[in-house]
Amino acid sequence: MAAACRTRAARKSGGSLVFAPVKVLAIDGGGIRGLIPALVLAEIERRTGRPTADLFDLIAGTSTGGILACGLTRPGPDGKPLHSADALAELYRTEGPKIFDRSLRKKLTSVGGLVDELYDDDALNAALAAYLGDARLKDAMTDVFITAYDIQGRFAFFFRSSRARTDETYDFAMADAARATAAAPTYFEPIEVTDAAGARTYPLIDGGVYAINPAMCAYAEVVGSGADISVIAALGTGAHTKPYEFEDVKGWGRLEWAQPVLDVVSDGLADTVDFEATTLSRGRYRRLQAELRYASDALDDASTANLRRLEGDAERLIAERSADIEALCEEVAG
């Protein structure tokens, strides 16, 4: 595991340094639906009386989960995390409608995302600048692991604060990491990010194309370094519930499948990670996923009505899984 993370989890035993098992938080991608894990984390912070960065040794995030990972670990001037989970939930309420607002020009030129991305990134960049400032990965209050994908090199790209602290060619601005992991194809244009040393530039898109649930990425990061895991808390952004009926689908071609195939692949990737993490973690995997009974499963429905519905689905998850959340709080706060 990252040396910083292992040191943070260390304790003294008989004069020797003993590394305690690592506590991991993984946050799914899901666009505006990131409001759900933000509210779950706000509840965890309320119950424990501690910031998320103080409860977990590693926070992994994809897309909107990567934005949360950066926001939760940005240091403030007092040496504590600058943002609470509740403050980040407010980001979705206030900035979400601006981020997912299509200009008339975009409506005309994108043709529903067929020939250009759906949204300009001005509002997204402004929000990330406001919430993340000039903080860099090396500054993170606890280890972060954020997914992206290099479209030129054709490889999975990982923003890792553990490497950023020891090698400036792996250090990036938090705002750039958050923007890269949020560069969902057809929604926002890709971004080029340059490391702190100015040695290399990477053209990146959303890590959700392969790791919508980054729990297994986090698992590999920890176990691959020889450390043990005490708990993996994996927060979803709401499960898709819309069925695709056989009689409707069997005659579909490329055009009809364009959006549904993204949903199906996303679900399949998340479910596969869920299975792998449950099997390999030997009872240490805690999945908190809301059923979207009323809210839209669209990544970009930031309407006032849907934001209220997302809050309602989050509140129901918290109520229905209250005992599980309490047990998790005891695990991570102990």
Task: Give, region by region, the residue ranges found by the protein language model.
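Conserved catalytic cores and adjacent C-terminal regulatory segments
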Residues: A2-G334
